[in-house]
Curated annotation (Swiss-Prot):
PROSITE patterns: RIBOSOMAL_L16_1 (PS00586), RIBOSOMAL_L16_2 (PS00701). One of its GO terms (biological process) is translation. Binds 23S rRNA and is also seen to make contacts with the A and possibly P site tRNAs. It comes from the Bacteria. The gene is rplP. HAMAP family: Ribosomal_uL16. Belongs to the universal ribosomal protein uL16 family. Keywords: Ribonucleoprotein, Ribosomal protein, RNA-binding, rRNA-binding, tRNA-binding. SUPFAM superfamilies: Ribosomal protein L16p/L10e. Coiled coil: none annotated. It comes from Pseudomonas fluorescens (strain Pf0-1). This is Large ribosomal subunit protein uL16. Part of the 50S ribosomal subunit. InterPro entries: Ribosomal_uL16, Ribosomal_uL16_bact-type, Ribosomal_uL16_CS, Ribosomal_uL16_dom, Ribosomal_uL16_sf.
Length: 137
């Protein structure tokens, strides 16, 4: 599972997930990409399950890049514990996603295979996504 090796602080405030993805919104490594259309959070488990779906579908052909990393800790209090007595322990890690953020990239496969693979991966994610191709400038 993806998570930072070490952080300056163990816990973070909830914060806001506003705006559009300015960084990481272009296809930079591969030929085809899966881009988010909606805003939300991706947990490390969701990122990993989508990656597995991608790699299983393309088999050995092609190279895959994961363009998101879960770097925000989400804390949770244990069940049946009263309120107060401090913030809960870190339960899992998330990546905050804005509309326009490229999530996965792939190259070395046909467009048809890439579309099928991204459709399988998108089914594992809680966000609306779209298929994009690299534009040559």
């Amino acid at each position: 599972m993806l998570q930072p090796k070490r952080t300056k602080f163990r816990k973070q405030m909830t914060g806001h997930n506003r705006g559009l993805a300015l960084r990481g919104s272009k296809v930079s490594f591969g030929e085809f990409a899966l881009k988010s259309v909606a805003r939300g959070r991706l947990t490390a488990r969701q990122i990993e399950s989508a990656r597995r779906a991608l790699t299983r579908h393309v088999k050995r052909g092609g190279k895959i890049w994961i363009r998101v990393f879960p770097d925000k800790p989400i804390s949770k209090k244990p069940l049946e514990v009263r309120m107060g007595k401090g913030k809960g322990n870190v339960e899992y890690w998330v990546a905050q996603i804005q509309p326009g953020k490229v999530l996965y990239e792939i190259e070395g496969v046909s467009e048809e295979l890439a579309r099928e693979a991204f459709a399988l991966a998108a089914a594992k994610l809680p966000l609306a996504t779209s298929f994009v191709k690299r534009t040559v400038m």
